[in-house]
Each structure stands twice: as C-alpha cells, then as structure tokens.
From Swiss-Prot:
Residues 292-534 form the Glutamine amidotransferase type-1 domain. The keyword Nucleotide-binding applies. Residues 1-266 are annotated as: Amidoligase domain. This is CTP synthase. Pathway: Pyrimidine metabolism; CTP biosynthesis via de novo pathway; CTP from UDP: step 2/2. The gene is pyrG. Mg(2+) binds at residues 72, 140. One of its GO terms (cellular component) is cytosol. One of its GO terms (molecular function) is glutaminase activity.
Amino acid sequence: MKTKFIFVTGGVVSSIGKGLASASLGALLEARGLRVSMQKLDPYINVDPGTMSPFQHGEVFVTDDGAETDLDLGHYERYTSARLSKRSNFTTGQVYFSVIEKERRGDYLGGTVQVIPHITDEIKHKILENAKGADVAIVEVGGTVGDIESLPFLEAIRQFKADRGAGNVLYLHVTLVPYIKTAGELKTKPTQHSVKELREIGIQPDILICRCEKDLPHDMKAKIALFCNVEEKGVITSADAEHIYAVPLALHKQGLDDQVVDKLNIWTKAPDLAPWESVVEKLRNPLKGEVHIAIVGKYVNLTESYKSLAEALTHGGIANDCRVYLRYLDSEKLESEGLGGLLDDVDAILVPGGFGERGTEGKIKAIEYARTRKVPFFGICLGMQMAVVEYARNVCGLDNAFSSEFRPDCANPVIHLMEEQKGVERKGGTMRLGAYPCSLSKGTFAHRAYGSLDVSERHRHRYEFNNAFREILVSKGLVISGIYKEGDLVEIVEVADHPWFLGCQFHPEFKSKPLNPHPLFRTFIAAALEHRGKRSQA
C-alpha cells in the first residue's frame, strides 16, 4: 500500500496536546493492524534539545540510536510499537544545517538558495525518509499556527497534498475551545481564528480535535463545522480525561479512526482495543490499593522534566494493579532544611537523573534514609551515582567520597569522567547516548526482575562508576549486578541486605509502556506495595 500521511498541527496555545492526540491516533491505527511511523517537527533553531534546560524544554527523550529528542517521542513510543530513531525528530536547526552543507558542497549548482524550494524540499525529504515502510505516517508539527518559525514547515506539508494526491494526505488540527467561567460559556472564536489562519497558509483541515474542559454540545459542533469548513462529524471533542491512557478510547468512541481510514481510503479490520480497556480499568479501579512514591530531584517545579519517569511508575502500578501517587521533593530544600519527616510516610524513594551539583547532598540524605530504614529505593543515572557516593561515605568510611563532576580535586572520586569523554569540549550530542548491552549477575534484584542475563538499555551520561574503588565497595557489601562487558563499566549496583535497593546508570523509563511495563518499575512498585503492607501492620 502506498504510504498515507497525516499531518497534525496545533492552534491557539502551545502544549495543547498535539503529542497525545498523535500518539493516541497511532495507537488506534495500530489496533486496526496498520504499520505506523511517528515523527515530530520542531521549529526551534537548536539542532536538538540536548543542551536545553529542563525548565525550558522539559524532558529530553533518548532513542535507541542515541538521538536526544522532544518529549513527545516518549508519548509515541509508549502508545505505539513504532521504533523511533534520529529521523523521528528534526528541527529548523537541522534543516538549515543540512541545506547549508549542501550549498557549500556545490549541490545546488550555483543557484540562489531560498526557503522555497530548498528548505521546504529538505523538510519533505526528511518526512519521506522516516515514512519508509509504513502504511500511515503521522507527522506532528510543533509550535502553534501563526508562529513565524513554523511557516516553512507548514508550507512543506501544504505541498504534500499536491505531491502525493488528495486521497493520500489528511490534515488534523488540534485547537482550544476555552470555557469562560464568569460567562459560563464555551467560546469557539479562538478555534475559528486558528483555522482561518491555517487556511490562509493554504491548508484546509479535514478533522478538528477540540480541547476543552467539557464535551461540546451538538449546536456548538455544528457552529465550528460551519465556520471552519469541515464536516460536523469531523469536529471531535477532546475533553479533559481522568487518565491520559483513556484518550485513545475516547477518540475512538467519537469515530476518529473510522473517519481517518475512510478519508484516506484504507480498508482495515475492526480495532482490537481490549488491551487499552484493560489498562484504563486498572487505572480507574485498582484491586490492590495504592502506594506513595517520593521523587527526590532538582527539577520538581516542572514535572514535565520527569515525564517518562512518572509514566513508567504509573505503568508499574498497572502491572501490580495498584494506584501510584507521586510526591515531588526538591533536593535543594532537603539539602538546606533537612528531611524533616517528609519521607516518613512514603512507600518508596526514587532519585532520578540530573546535572549539576545543586541539590546533590539532599539526594544523598534521602538515599541514606532509604538504605538505613529499609525503604525500597531506585536510583537512576545521577541517582545511581549518588547512591554509590552515599555508600562509600557511610558504609566504607570514605569521608570525602564524591563525583569528580562536582569536585575535580576530591580525595575519593568514586564517580569519574568516562575515558572516552576526556578531551571532549563540545556539549551537544557528545555524551554516551543510546542503547548499550548490559550483562546481569544471577540471583540479583536485576536478574529476578528481567528474567534474563542479557538486556539492552538507553543511556545519557558522561560520568561513570570509578573501578579504582570497586574492590573496597564490594568488600563492604555493595553488589555489582550489571556491567557493560566491552568497557567493564558498572551499570547496576544493589544493596543485598535490603528489601529492594537498586541503582542503574541507564534510563529504564524510556522503554516502559502501559501495555508492557518495564520490569524494574514493575518490581520496584511491587516492593513499595509490600513495604506499605508491613508499615500498616506495624
């Protein structure tokens, strides 16, 4: 079958939910047996988000092949089986970089390089490359219609209908219908103006997904359809959902996927949504109660920084049929003000990845609490490194143990710069990135969780466990349960005399899905559930 293209745009405001809408549509089309590719186009000039502050951009999602990408790719991977790569996310910076390189090589034969056709052709080329082998390619355009940065991308996708034929391209626009509480009314004018602006560019949307607090009444749908020149059935309500994994079911109920396959002339089987129905049922009515997890981090004022992590913990709850509540604790405050009983009523503690020295001592305090009080603990990336520092200081007696990232002249650098990182000066795209194999030791927490001795996980770091201190740490009871054999790099550490204490250098949250929870999060939440049971009996 010739590949069909669905372009998803957004209007009125940013962060309106284009990523979730795209991912949910991908899930629905896969449930019909179609092969789906997913892609995000970002209009900013950065080459990628790898050097951007989490407070600016939120989480940086890492793919198997080492791309540092937009967090929406995390939604795509969680909702679909699409294998994402460096081609799945590109920016204005990458497009211009590629075009300028071609011009310098003389590829344009002395011609004047312009936005049209050269930039738009490069955008179309990147879209087509990622779509190879797919029945349907879903392409989300970042930003908001009306942004000057988005214009070349919108022009490129406008040209697709002429290039590929009307029956092979569909435009889906996600827009806002705000509820004005003082007036007690939903307002359609922002949507009308957003679509008007899109049509002025030359794109007529086929389907509108209207984000709103409550369902749109029939007369309002009819009004939007009339003013925006779409069929009334093409006006889809996306009211605020109790759980984000209920969104595919809500969109299916309104016939979104039926309309898409009809407009694109695709014959498919009826969708099998039983797995999604099971997930939503477990989220709404968990049989085994609840657990409370403390996330001790640096970026807690913007929880989007930990998007995949929060979702992976939810997946662990789905696997254990329990509800997961997250308590975000600022590690800087713990550092300056102490724990103050903040961890006394939690069922498990997690210290996530991060960069910079600020808040590290607060994380170490939380880790010591978890280790000594036998509270289930999970350390990821920097969290694993700080667990090693805590163990070195408080169990091995290495008083000045720390990471050379923060104190280059510390006496006991139990965490140090990786050998291949020495001499690296450029910041962008130079970390240890992407999937690497990890060999596990029999009988460990990790081995029991995975049920295998060989696994592959995704990384994003420059610093590692210092093997010069391996002997003393192991002699005092630290378990090295996972290594990267090729470089003899320590990937997983555990504390044996503990219900569940594990730190990993990689980011397992990037591979967790609601339909297939990651084994480490599954067993971590199981340990939290068990700990809660013991606390309630005490």
